[in-house]
Protein backbone atom coordinates (compact mmCIF):
# COMPACT_ATOMS: atom_id res chain seq x y z
CA UNK A 1 0.00 0.00 0.00
CA UNK A 2 2.84 2.42 0.78
CA UNK A 3 4.11 2.13 -2.80
CA UNK A 4 1.09 4.09 -4.02
CA UNK A 5 1.69 7.14 -1.87
CA UNK A 6 2.90 10.25 -3.68
CA UNK A 7 5.74 12.58 -2.68
CA UNK A 8 3.14 15.03 -1.35
CA UNK A 9 2.07 12.47 1.24
CA UNK A 10 5.45 12.91 2.95
CA UNK A 11 5.86 16.67 2.43
CA UNK A 12 4.78 19.42 4.77
CA UNK A 13 1.54 21.20 4.00
CA UNK A 14 2.32 24.88 3.33
CA UNK A 15 -1.21 26.10 2.73
CA UNK A 16 -4.55 25.27 1.19
CA UNK A 17 -7.03 26.42 -1.42
CA UNK A 18 -9.26 29.03 0.26
CA UNK A 19 -11.16 30.11 -2.86
CA UNK A 20 -11.94 28.06 -5.94
CA UNK A 21 -14.05 29.07 -8.93
CA UNK A 22 -14.09 27.35 -12.31
CA UNK A 23 -11.31 25.29 -13.86
CA UNK A 24 -7.90 25.01 -12.14
CA UNK A 25 -5.32 22.27 -11.67
CA UNK A 26 -2.56 21.76 -9.12
CA UNK A 27 0.44 19.98 -10.62
CA UNK A 28 2.32 18.04 -7.96
CA UNK A 29 6.00 17.13 -7.94
CA UNK A 30 6.42 14.20 -10.29
CA UNK A 31 3.77 15.41 -12.70
CA UNK A 32 0.54 14.32 -10.99
CA UNK A 33 -2.34 16.74 -11.75
CA UNK A 34 -5.02 17.26 -9.10
CA UNK A 35 -8.19 19.22 -9.81
CA UNK A 36 -8.35 22.23 -7.52
CA UNK A 37 -11.06 22.28 -4.89
CA UNK A 38 -11.76 24.18 -1.70
CA UNK A 39 -9.52 23.10 1.23
CA UNK A 40 -7.11 21.17 -1.03
CA UNK A 41 -3.68 20.99 0.64
CA UNK A 42 -0.81 22.84 -1.08
CA UNK A 43 2.84 21.76 -0.86
CA UNK A 44 6.20 23.29 -1.79
CA UNK A 45 6.98 22.72 -5.47
CA UNK A 46 3.30 22.63 -6.51
CA UNK A 47 2.33 24.50 -9.68
CA UNK A 48 -1.06 26.22 -9.87
CA UNK A 49 -2.50 26.39 -13.39
CA UNK A 50 -5.85 28.05 -14.00
CA UNK A 51 -7.98 27.70 -17.08
CA UNK A 52 -11.31 29.48 -16.96
CA UNK A 53 -11.09 29.74 -13.18
CA UNK A 54 -9.63 31.51 -10.15
CA UNK A 55 -7.84 30.06 -7.13
CA UNK A 56 -6.73 31.69 -3.88
CA UNK A 57 -4.09 30.02 -1.74
CA UNK A 58 -3.84 30.73 1.99
CA UNK A 59 -0.31 29.97 3.16
CA UNK A 60 0.60 28.86 6.70
CA UNK A 61 2.08 32.29 7.54
CA UNK A 62 -1.16 34.09 6.51
CA UNK A 63 0.19 35.10 3.09
CA UNK A 64 -2.57 35.07 0.49
CA UNK A 65 -2.00 34.59 -3.23
CA UNK A 66 -4.83 34.91 -5.75
CA UNK A 67 -4.25 33.28 -9.15
CA UNK A 68 -6.67 34.55 -11.81
CA UNK A 69 -7.92 33.00 -15.05
CA UNK A 70 -5.38 31.60 -17.52
CA UNK A 71 -2.43 31.98 -15.13
CA UNK A 72 0.45 29.85 -13.91
CA UNK A 73 2.23 30.10 -10.56
CA UNK A 74 5.13 27.85 -9.50
CA UNK A 75 5.69 27.54 -5.75
CA UNK A 76 9.39 26.99 -5.15
CA UNK A 77 9.44 26.62 -1.40
CA UNK A 78 7.74 27.80 1.76
CA UNK A 79 9.28 27.24 5.19
CA UNK A 80 7.65 28.72 8.30
CA UNK A 81 8.13 28.54 12.08
CA UNK A 82 4.90 29.74 13.76
CA UNK A 83 6.69 30.20 17.10
CA UNK A 84 9.11 32.82 15.77
CA UNK A 85 6.93 33.86 12.79
CA UNK A 86 9.98 33.50 10.55
CA UNK A 87 10.79 31.46 7.50
CA UNK A 88 11.13 31.88 3.76
CA UNK A 89 8.81 31.98 0.78
CA UNK A 90 9.68 31.87 -2.90
CA UNK A 91 7.63 31.42 -6.04
CA UNK A 92 7.51 32.31 -9.73
CA UNK A 93 4.63 33.92 -11.56
CA UNK A 94 5.00 32.67 -15.13
CA UNK A 95 1.80 33.75 -16.92
CA UNK A 96 -1.37 35.71 -16.22
CA UNK A 97 -2.25 37.79 -13.18
CA UNK A 98 -1.41 36.98 -9.57
CA UNK A 99 -2.18 39.10 -6.51
CA UNK A 100 0.08 38.78 -3.48
CA UNK A 101 -0.85 39.86 0.08
CA UNK A 102 1.93 39.64 2.68
CA UNK A 103 1.79 37.31 5.63
CA UNK A 104 4.05 36.92 8.66
CA UNK A 105 7.24 35.99 6.78
CA UNK A 106 7.30 39.28 4.83
CA UNK A 107 6.39 41.26 7.95
CA UNK A 108 9.13 39.79 10.18
CA UNK A 109 11.89 39.32 7.61
CA UNK A 110 11.09 40.83 4.19
CA UNK A 111 14.35 39.64 2.63
CA UNK A 112 13.12 36.06 3.09
CA UNK A 113 10.42 36.52 0.43
CA UNK A 114 11.47 36.16 -3.19
CA UNK A 115 8.99 36.46 -6.02
CA UNK A 116 10.11 36.15 -9.61
CA UNK A 117 8.60 36.80 -13.01
CA UNK A 118 10.28 36.04 -16.35
CA UNK A 119 11.78 39.56 -16.36
CA UNK A 120 11.96 40.75 -12.74
CA UNK A 121 12.56 39.83 -9.11
CA UNK A 122 10.26 41.44 -6.56
CA UNK A 123 11.33 42.14 -2.99
CA UNK A 124 8.42 42.48 -0.58
CA UNK A 125 8.26 44.67 2.50
CA UNK A 126 4.84 43.81 3.93
CA UNK A 127 2.24 44.84 1.37
CA UNK A 128 -0.10 43.85 -1.47
CA UNK A 129 0.59 43.98 -5.19
CA UNK A 130 -0.39 42.41 -8.47
CA UNK A 131 1.81 41.15 -11.24
CA UNK A 132 0.63 40.40 -14.75
CA UNK A 133 2.81 38.45 -17.14
CA UNK A 134 1.86 38.35 -20.82
CA UNK A 135 2.59 35.63 -23.37
CA UNK A 136 6.02 37.09 -24.27
CA UNK A 137 7.11 37.46 -20.64
CA UNK A 138 6.55 41.19 -20.12
CA UNK A 139 5.78 41.88 -16.43
CA UNK A 140 3.45 44.64 -15.19
CA UNK A 141 3.65 45.14 -11.42
CA UNK A 142 1.23 47.37 -9.48
CA UNK A 143 1.56 48.23 -5.77
CA UNK A 144 -1.77 48.10 -3.91
CA UNK A 145 -2.89 49.45 -0.55
CA UNK A 146 -3.28 46.83 2.19
CA UNK A 147 -6.53 47.12 4.13
CA UNK A 148 -7.64 45.32 7.26
CA UNK A 149 -11.19 44.16 8.03
CA UNK A 150 -11.98 47.54 9.64
CA UNK A 151 -11.13 49.39 6.42
CA UNK A 152 -7.84 50.79 7.73
CA UNK A 153 -5.43 50.94 4.80
CA UNK A 154 -1.69 51.46 4.47
CA UNK A 155 0.83 51.20 1.66
CA UNK A 156 3.95 49.14 2.10
CA UNK A 157 6.89 48.92 -0.24
CA UNK A 158 8.27 46.60 -2.89
CA UNK A 159 11.46 46.59 -4.89
CA UNK A 160 11.44 45.53 -8.53
CA UNK A 161 14.79 44.43 -9.90
CA UNK A 162 15.78 43.54 -13.45
CA UNK A 163 19.02 43.43 -15.42
CA UNK A 164 18.58 47.18 -15.98
CA UNK A 165 18.55 48.01 -12.25
CA UNK A 166 16.16 48.33 -9.33
CA UNK A 167 13.29 50.65 -8.43
CA UNK A 168 11.45 51.05 -5.12
CA UNK A 169 7.67 51.38 -5.25
CA UNK A 170 5.94 52.92 -2.21
CA UNK A 171 2.89 54.81 -3.54
CA UNK A 172 -0.55 53.19 -3.87
CA UNK A 173 -1.23 52.10 -7.45
CA UNK A 174 2.32 52.90 -8.55
CA UNK A 175 3.17 50.65 -11.51
CA UNK A 176 6.15 49.52 -13.52
CA UNK A 177 6.54 47.42 -16.66
CA UNK A 178 9.56 45.24 -17.32
CA UNK A 179 9.39 44.34 -21.02
CA UNK A 180 12.50 42.24 -21.46
CA UNK A 181 15.27 40.90 -19.28
CA UNK A 182 17.39 43.97 -19.99
CA UNK A 183 14.76 46.72 -19.62
CA UNK A 184 13.30 48.49 -16.60
Model region roles, listed by residue range:
Residues 6-8:
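N-terminal signal peptide c-region/cleavage motif recognized by signal peptidases
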Residues 130, 183-184:
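Outer membrane pore-forming secretion/assembly proteins and partners of Gram-negative envelopes
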Residues 1-3:
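Sec-dependent signal peptide recognition
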